[in-house]
Amino acid sequence: MELRQLRAFVEVAEAGHFGHAAEHLHLTQPALTQRIQALERELGLQLLERNARGVRLAPSGTVLLPHARRLIQTEDQALGDLRAYLSGTIGRLRIAYQAAGDIPTAASLIAEYRQRFPAVEVDT
């Protein structure tokens, strides 16, 4: 089971239509259909009930949907955190300075940095 298959499944389940879901995912409808079919084959379950008017969740799809949403949300959060880490807006900053200098200036700079980047842990 791949996350891209789960994304496709969630999108079809929410759109209720393969065409609309394919458009939103920037896929062709046949490519989307293949992803869903591969997922169903792998699980050995029919997740969606297809009819002339569109698609609705099969009972097994109803069971899978909340789990698929959580997995996708977790992946999105992990990728967002990694982007923040790479951009320097999350992580840890260690600062060492000599107390003999202008301490109020150093303290104000550190306070300003903490305010600007609250997700960065600052050790002094």
Language-model features, listed with the residues they occupy:
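A short LG(V/I)-centered, amphipathic sequence patch enriched
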Residues: 40-59
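Core residues of bacterial helix-turn-helix
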Residues: 24-25, 36, 43, 64
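Short helix-boundary/capping micro-motifs
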Residues: 12-27
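Alpha-helical linker/hinge and terminal dimerization helices associated
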Residues: 42-43, 64-86
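The N-cap/first-turn positions of alpha helices
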Residues: 2-8, 29, 54, 61, ...
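Central regulatory/effector-binding core of bacterial HTH transcription factors
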Residues: 90-124
